[in-house]
Amino acid sequence: MDKQNQIGDFLKFLGPQIGQEIHVGPWLEIDQQRINQFAEVTGDQQWIHIDPERAAKESPYGTTVAHGYLTLSLLPYLTQSNHPDFFQKNYPGMKYRVNYGLNRVRFPSPVKVGSKIRARTTIQTAEEVKNGVQICYIITVDIESEEKPACSVEFLARLYP
């Protein structure tokens, strides 16, 4: 089958899923070790992230909180989007996916140390682009037992046959 037909078939496959939640990921506990490792790697050593004693006294949250970008960096795990089973199920006929970008990244609520987070993924749009398909996902990262999410983002991915 030629690439143009593969693209057309893939768009037909995606059509009924537009606007649908396609995945709810596993809960992941955010511990202080993970926060500290992220701080070390990124150089973001702000006390609100890495100093539990000071955060307990001075932070409005009463504890340390994860970096917003830590939450964002966990999207591949939280969405399971790079797992071979996820790829095979959700991208039939496609060989590879590349991250194209992010829109509307927001961090409505902090992730306190010890909190559990998970991601919900919804397909917003799918359209043909040169030699492939671009999908815009809405990803919402929930915090267990919290009303407001930790993060919401439009994630753009491009897939190619």
PLM feature segments, named:
Residues M1-Q17, F107-P161:
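HotDog/MaoC-like acyl-thioester-processing domains
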Residues D2-V98:
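Hot-dog-fold acyl-thioester-processing enzymes
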Residues H23, W27-E29, R106, L156-R158:
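Generic structural detector for well-ordered beta-strands
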Residues Y100-R104:
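A beta-strand/beta-hairpin structural motif
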